[in-house]
Amino acid sequence: MLTDDPGSTEPLVVTHDGPIATLWLNRPEKRNAVTKAMWEGIAAICAEFATDRTVRVLVVRGAGDHFCAGADIGELEVSDSSYAAANAGADTALGSFPKPTIAFVRGSCVGGGTQIAIACDVRVADTSAVFGITPARLGIVYPAFGVDRAVRLLGPSATKHLLFSAELIGWERALRIGLVDEVHEPAAADERIDAFATLLATQRSLLTQESSKAMVDECVRTGEISRATQARWGAELAASTDAAEGVAAFLERRPPRFTWAGTSD
């Protein structure tokens, strides 16, 4: 199911470029449609990399010309509670991943593909990208956690429009409603995703990234940031040398060398 071989035919492939891990959905002949086993694999990969201090950024992308055309329809015909559990597990693992996650979208990003993209922190697309949430075409109920994430990202009106109509939208509208954060021409998109991931992984404080992600997510969920969360990250800051290093690097006009690598708990 999982391999580090970039030439593999396995449906999930992980490649590494220093501190950047890339998770490839690798069924290009099926537009990277996701099977139950792939949902389970995504959860397992996220669990492994969440505590791997050599991994600073996770990029999710599709092999070939498409990101992900959604769930494998053949499996939906015989899906049961275990399929729903696998889907929920992947969504939770990706959405709660403590380090920055980037979805790199080209071509189809539909149904479960949109669910994966929304679970990531940042979505970068090229101009071939097409998005949709399409359960209304199939007569199925979209997962509640997927609806919840979509509403929090897009707002209720845009989410209802996508769910009610099952229409596919291009990058222009996706950018307008906040479904993607950046769009680039195909020739420039790969270079941009590499540069952005490298920036996050090598020149920015992981302490700032993880604390910001935790506080933003908590604020979205509950409407506030608890004192316990504030105290936790205050303690991490006090125990870290990153703040002193950041100030010194700024004054000395050099790139910072941040050393914080993960929470102490």
Residues covered by each model-derived region:
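Terminal low-complexity tails and localization/encapsulation signals of metabolic enzymes
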Residues: M1-T9, A248-D265
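C-terminal long alpha-helix characteristic of the crotonase
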Residues: V124-A129, V180-A228, T241, R257-D265
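Conserved CoA-thioester-binding segment of acyl-CoA-metabolizing enzymes
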Residues: M1-A63, A187
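Glycine- (often His-adjacent) and acidic-residue-rich active-site loop
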Residues: T54, G62-S96, C109, G139
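Well-ordered beta-strand positions
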Residues: V122, H161, S165-E167, R173, ...
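CoA-thioester-processing core
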Residues: A90, L94-S96, F104, V110-L163, ...
